[in-house]
From Swiss-Prot:
Allosterically activated by GTP, when glutamine is the substrate; GTP has no effect on the reaction when ammonia is the substrate. The allosteric effector GTP functions by stabilizing the protein conformation that binds the tetrahedral intermediate(s) formed during glutamine hydrolysis. Inhibited by the product CTP, via allosteric rather than competitive inhibition. Residues 1-267 are annotated as: Amidoligase domain. GO terms for cellular component: cytosol. It is an enzyme of class 6 (ligase). It comes from Prochlorococcus marinus subsp. pastoris (strain CCMP1986 / NIES-2087 / MED4). L-glutamine binds at residues 354, 382-385, 405, 462. This is CTP synthase.
Amino acid sequence: MSKFVFVTGGVVSSIGKGIVAASLGRLLKSRGYSVSILKLDPYLNVDPGTMSPFQHGEVFVTEDGAETDLDLGHYERFTDTAMTRLNSVTTGSIYQAVINKERRGSYNGGTVQVIPHITREIRERIHRVAANSNADIVITEIGGTVGDIESLPFLEAIREFKNDVNKNDVAYIHVTLLPYIKTSGEIKTKPTQHSVKELRSIGIQPDLLVCRSDKEINEGLKRKLSGFCGVNLNCVIEALDADSIYSVPLSLKNEGLCKQTLNCLELEDKECDLENWEKIIHNLRNPGNPIKVALVGKYIELGDAYLSVVEALRHACIEQKALLDLYWISAEMIEEKSAEEYLNDVDAIVVPGGFGNRGVNGKIEAIKFAREKNIPFLGLCLGMQCAVIEWARNIAQLPDASSSELNPDSENPVIHLLPEQEDIVDLGGTMRLGVYPCRLQKNTTGKELYNEDVIYERHRHRYEFNNYYKQSFLDSGYKISGTSPDGRLVELIELVDHPYFLACQYHPEFLSRPGKPHPLFKGLIKASQEKLEQSN
């Protein structure tokens, strides 16, 4: 029988609930408990798949093909546990399910209301995660901030949830902010008191307070919060601003978050094994020489749009004992000026995924620069498609070569729509999504990096390499190092006479973990280090 932990946030948005939930998951797993983490998002979109990266950040893709909130990436990276579509719930998906049931007559003509129908559907989703994962502990993060009207059905649902299970099977954690007023030199607790008061008015009494602060919280403040908020003194947890998100589990462990959560759930506080995690933090805090990596994207104004790519680069640098020096380069800026102006001093170039025409020519110019100047390069999804277009235009002498997405009238569509996508009208949840196998070819860099015959990678795309141009591509110095098992789809390409030039149609960043960097990212950083050593 699973136990349940609910994580809410107060005072301000972006308080770090996702990192707290992921860190608790890491701490519980280090004690031998199995964990699954669920995100409840209070927006009306069915999923974030069609949302702008500028508004929502990256869309994280699960093994079973769900387009989810980026917090699921944190959950997977911290716990090294794969999540599924069940782990991502939005208000839109809840209402859609309830309305579909009403249309089918499932409510026997009854009046459908937020209470009990919407809240019951939410509770059923949480129970479904527990049943599907068979986890010892299910952690549920409630998106938004206590007091938001959008979050009310979720908060009511988790209030009701304690009636579904035994009292000691549920714990409520409230993440809040203690602002420091510089002029008075004081940390203020009043916003937290009001946030907890709001929770109590709904019927939820938090068991633990996780207090975000950039100043240390003294014993007196903890006692004050304990008294005003009705929380045991040992359950007032300090969460100071950290130098890295990966150091948060260790600081929360020292504050007793996991121990007190287990105490609330009446579970054994087993011996904790964080030795590998401590090694990761040691390498992170004691890096070697910097590696200057240019991330050439079209959504760089919001760093979260490429969150998993950045974390994958960080994991590789931690493993290789290098300092990640990340250059955020707008592809449109390269179009306006030149690749040389922005990329001349970098050690590696990454061109990530994206959609649409904007900035594509800048990406292509960056790839050309990497190819001609022998700069280690990694292309992801659209990055691979741009690498193929760059080859066609500059090596194969097909100046009008393009993708049928970018130029439907091109006479040389070296990238074209997957056949199964041709009759699809809806945008949401209809791409090639989730894990697919890829067979690696012998005597390729890809095979050497993975050291596997068949790999499994996550996808999110509609367009693929046009096999009509395959032989011409191979004859010009490129290798196709990975394909679908039937050989129909090109998944991984590489340039032969180059220090490191690989591009893949899939998204390897979703499978990178701290302590277990993805082979393609590790290979990129290693190649950059080797090239630097040779130049010195």
